[in-house]
Design a protein with these regions (language model features):
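Flexible, glycine-rich active-site loops centered on histidine and acidic residues
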Residues: 2-25, 85-151, 195-197, 202-207
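An alpha-helical appendage that flanks or caps ligand/catalytic pockets
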Residues: 5, 9, 127-164, 205-305, ...
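Active-site mouth loops of central-metabolism enzymes
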Residues: 13-27, 81-89, 171-181, 279-288
């Protein structure tokens, strides 16, 4: 199993202390988190994309380019990049450039994105967002794989024998499809033979397990080898401590503050108590053995081989968050790496693709 640390780069007051860092300092924290993730042995570091408050992750390609410059080994992920909002040509140019700057360490997780404010900002409607996502990915995928592309498009000017530069370092690149609430993303991933990444954050396991089950069914429907299927899954929070009592005591102020924030902003409160949250959500809060057992329970339902945890302290003190990550890597990760297989593909950077030939593939 592989482990990612991800951030959506939320920028709001600390849920416990109420203190708020500057925008500049928040970005420096992201870079510090990436360095720490590599230092502790995480396999990937992800940056989300949001275009509405309280997030400042509107340019993940730019942030990940800086992360690439301050790291050497760890793979870099978009978590997710919102192709339904973007021109696929510009998205391709940005990520092909990042692919080179990172020496081929880039993985993409794509999705339609969440939030009415960012849909309004880009003039995307709930009715057309899925069609936009599918079309943008189709064009993006062709641009990455082919030297010239012709495509009749609905949501951007059509392409006619188009060349787009730079050509990528990895060819093809691995693209995951983020899945939170809809079978559309699961079906799109299965259709193209791409891996699925379940958000697995807001609710108990059942709706996410149903989407993963649907993805596996559609994977076989489209004729792909069941042995090549790959699933990733997120977590709603992380705090590992020597004992469950210590973990719950440290996390309780975080949970209470987050629940109060949800109530104030009109968000649904799914878990009323910390104990219920620790038991029925995907959050990994407890002793090392409790965390190991919980990941196994989720693996029994998902069959996932990649797991993401939160890179941000999120209300914990910096020292307590680091201690949690260190304990996770020292006592949790080795056991899970032994028990759960790796994804069915190489994780390391691949060799550059040979130079383009004069032959052109038409679409």
């Amino acid at each position: 199993v592989k482990f990612l640390a991800i951030t959506l780069v939320a920028h709001r007051p600390d849920p416990v202390t109420g203190e708020r860092t500057s925008t500049h300092q928040r970005f420096r924290e992201v870079l510090d988190s990436a360095r720490l993730a590599e230092e502790l042995g995480f396999d990937g570091f992800g940056v989300g994309e949001r275009h509405e408050r309280p997030f400042i992750s509107s340019s993940p390609a730019v942030v990940l380019s800086h992360v690439a410059a301050v790291t050497r080994r760890i793979r870099l992920f978009t978590a997710v990049t919102t192709l339904s909002l973007l021109d696929p040509v510009r998205a391709y140019e940005d990520y092909a450039t990042l692919d080179h700057l990172s020496d081929g360490r880039l993985d993409l997780i794509i999705g339609k994105g969440n939030g009415a404010a960012q849909r309004d900002l880009f003039h995307v409607t709930p009715e057309d967002q899925w069609a936009r996502n599918a079309e943008s990915y189709d064009v993006f995928r062709r641009l990455w794989r082919q030297d010239r592309v012709t495509a009749a498009t609905r949501f951007r000017p059509p392409l006619q024998d188009a060349e787009v530069w730079p050509r990528p370092f990895q060819r093809p690149i691995r693209v995951w499809h983020g899945s939170a609430t809809s079978k559309d993303s699961a079906d799109l991933a299965a259709r193209h033979g791409d891996p699925l990444f379940s958000a697995n954050v807001t609710h108990p396991i059942e709706p996410y397990a149903e989407l993963v089950r649907h993805y596996r069914e559609r994977w076989e429907h489209y004729g792909h080898d069941p042995a090549r299927v790959a699933v990733g899954a997120g977590t709603a929070g992380l705090h590992v401590a020597p004992t469950s009592q210590e973990a719950l005591a440290a996390y309780r102020p975080v949970f209470e503050a987050n629940r109060a924030f949800a109530e104030q902003t009109g968000l649904p409160v799914v878990f009323e108590t910390l104990e219920d949250f620790a038991e029925r959500s995907s959050a990994l809060i407890g002793s090392p053995q409790q965390v190991i057992d919980k990941v196994h329970r989720y693996h029994d339902r998902f069959g996932h081989t990649v797991l993401h945890v939160q890179a941000d302290a999120g209300g914990l003190t910096a020292s307590r968050h680091r201690a949690s990550l260190e304990l996770f890597q020292a006592q949790v990760a080795p056991v899970l790496r032994r028990d759960i297989p790796d994804p069915p593909f190489a994780w390391e950077p691949v060799l550059p693709f040979p130079a383009p030939t004069q032959e052109t593939t038409r679409v």
